Amino acid sequence: MFNFLRNLFSSDPEKKEERSRLRAQKKHDQRIASKQVLSDEWHPVNFPYQATIFNIQRANKGYGSTCQISVRYIENEQYKDMIYLVNPKVKSFSFSNYHDIKPEDVADAPVFKDVWPEIEPYFTGKNVITYYADAHLRALQATLQKNHISEPEMHFIDLYDYFCERHDSWESFSLDYVAEKLDLDSYPSAKHPKATLDTITEILELMYEKRPGILRKLLGVKAKRK
């Protein structure tokens, strides 16, 4: 026991350095794990239609600099999440203060062309939804083009456009403002991608409850005949 304690609290420089390295590695691994969801289970949701919600974070102002892509797939009143860090292979990470993704976080992450096959089935031929397409759809398109990948055929819906068209008296159309205006339980955060996915999901659930006809029209779903 004495030898064990002596080794544990040893002042040996090499052992101290190794302990420090292991602590740093553990902290890094925990940080990376908090920014990804690589294997999710199905969760219940009050939404009967198919939908793919996605959100992208970029390393910098370049639309092809995707460093994180978050996807929530909804089907049969269930959803599962897929959140990937992506190595954008860029030098500038000027948006780090916004989303808290740093170069070291993506240093060992896969590049987009290796992530895309994992999520492509949830885009091709699907109802694909985001909030503010000028940021997220544009980033997806630019990143696909950068990696010489064809853009999939999909039925795209921008909820930002929906609120702009129907609530033109509102002071703002940012997602956080909409969340407050609708008194949602969830609140979007660039640093917490699941929170943003939750917010958009809650909007869809609310539309299903309060505006089912408009929702079906957006999704291209025909009303059932009585």
Q: What kind of region is each of these model predictions?
A:
Residues 35-153, 176-188:
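Conserved non-catalytic scaffold segment of RNase H-like nuclease domains
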Residues 115, 163, 198-199:
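Short Asp/Glu-rich motifs
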Residues 127-134, 139-144, 174-226:
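Acidic, Mg2+-coordinating catalytic module of metal-dependent nucleases/exonucleases
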Residues 157-174:
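Short alpha-helix plus adjacent loop in nuclease-associated cores
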Residues 109, 157, 192:
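Residue-level "edge-of-site" marker
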Residues 2-43, 181, 201-226:
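Acidic two-metal-ion nuclease catalytic site recognized across multiple nuclease folds
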Residues 91, 162-165, 195:
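A short acidic, often aromatic-flanked loop/helix-cap motif at beta-alpha or helix-coil junctions
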Residues 151-155, 213-214:
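Short, structured loop/turn "capping" segments at alpha-beta junctions
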